[in-house]
Amino acid sequence: MEQGKGLAGLFLVISLLQGTMAQQKEEKHLVKVDDSQGDGSVLLTCDFNEKTITWLKDGHRISPPNATKSTWNLGNGAKDPRGMYQCRGAKKKSQLLQVYYRLCENCIELNMGTVSGFIFAEIISIFFLAVGVYFIAGQDGVRQSRASDKQTLLQNEQVYQPLKDREYEQYSRLQGNQVRKK
């Protein structure tokens, strides 16, 4: 059992060392993306100190030959400038950079002001709902009964009113289908 733990620990140490070695060998990013332009355009910037820079998209050259611009305008971000971009000089080339824009037409940018506005609106709506329920529910319990609200249906507080004899009204017959004698 101890030998298995030691082997697992050795495997963990080796994998961590390989990760740090790969990170040290990694080149710095030579192509940078700038999408904070006022007109919504996306710019790629290549950090080469060379005279001629060639821009590639998906392995095909997109810049004119012998171009000297270290920046490349991809156009508006709404036009979806997707692809694998790379800049190449006379002596070296950059790593591939994948540009992928996912546009959302019905999205809301959630910053601190938007979230606090939602919370404030929710608190205000709950307050008005609670006040409305309080005033509607509180009206019935506070009202006192008045003498004019009470109607006297039967005289002298009788429980039942006797039926009058020989009247053919709706409630004068109590025995169903039998007809009363006249």
UniProtKB/Swiss-Prot annotation:
Q: Which cysteines are joined by disulfide bonds?
A: C46-C87
Q: Topological domain, Extracellular: which ranges?
A: 23-116
Q: Which InterPro entries match?
A: CD3_esu/gsu/dsu (IPR015484), Ig-like_dom_sf (IPR036179), Ig-like_fold (IPR013783), Ig_4 (IPR032052), Ig_sub2 (IPR003598), Phos_immunorcpt_sig_ITAM (IPR003110)
| Membrane topology, record value | Single-pass type I membrane protein
Cellular-component GO terms for this entry = alpha-beta T cell receptor complex; external side of plasma membrane
Q: Where is this motif: Di-leucine motif?
A: 153-154
Segments forming domain Ig-like: 37-94
Glycan-linked positions? N66
Topological domains on the Cytoplasmic side lie at 138-182
One GO-annotated biological process of the protein: regulation of lymphocyte apoptotic process
Please state where this protein is localized. Answer: Cell membrane
Primary localisation category: membrane
Residues covered by the ITAM domain: 149-177
PTM comment, free text? Phosphorylated on Tyr residues after T-cell receptor triggering by LCK in association with CD4/CD8. Phosphorylated also by PKC; leading to the TCR complex down-regulation. Phosphorylated on Tyr residues after T-cell receptor triggering by LCK in association with CD4/CD8.
A Pfam family reported for this protein in Swiss-Prot or TrEMBL: Ig_4
Keywords of this protein's UniProt record, alphabetized?
A: Adaptive immunity, Cell membrane, Disulfide bond, Glycoprotein, Immunity, Immunoglobulin domain, Membrane, Phosphoprotein, Receptor, Signal, Transmembrane, Transmembrane helix
Phosphoserine PTM positions: S145, S148
Q: Carries keyword Glycoprotein?
A: yes
Endpoints of the signal sequence: 1-22
Q: Name one GO molecular function term.
A: identical protein binding
- TM region positions: 117-137
Q: What is known of its domains?
A: A di-leucine motif and a tyrosine-based motif are individually sufficient to induce both endocytosis and delivery to lysosomes.
Report quaternary structure and partners.
The TCR-CD3 complex is composed of a CD3D/CD3E and a CD3G/CD3E heterodimers that preferentially associate with TCRalpha and TCRbeta, respectively, to form TCRalpha/CD3E/CD3G and TCRbeta/CD3G/CD3E trimers. In turn, the hexamer interacts with CD3Z homodimer to form the TCR-CD3 complex. Alternatively, TCRalpha and TCRbeta can be replaced by TCRgamma and TCRdelta.
Function, as annotated, reads: Part of the TCR-CD3 complex present on T-lymphocyte cell surface that plays an essential role in adaptive immune response. When antigen presenting cells (APCs) activate T-cell receptor (TCR), TCR-mediated signals are transmitted across the cell membrane by the CD3 chains CD3D, CD3E, CD3G and CD3Z. All CD3 chains contain immunoreceptor tyrosine-based activation motifs (ITAMs) in their cytoplasmic domain. Upon TCR engagement, these motifs become phosphorylated by Src family protein tyrosine kinases LCK and FYN, resulting in the activation of downstream signaling pathways.
The protein's name is: T-cell surface glycoprotein CD3 gamma chain
Question: Which organism does this sequence originate in?
Answer: Rattus norvegicus
Source taxonomy: Eukaryota, Metazoa, Chordata, Craniata, Vertebrata
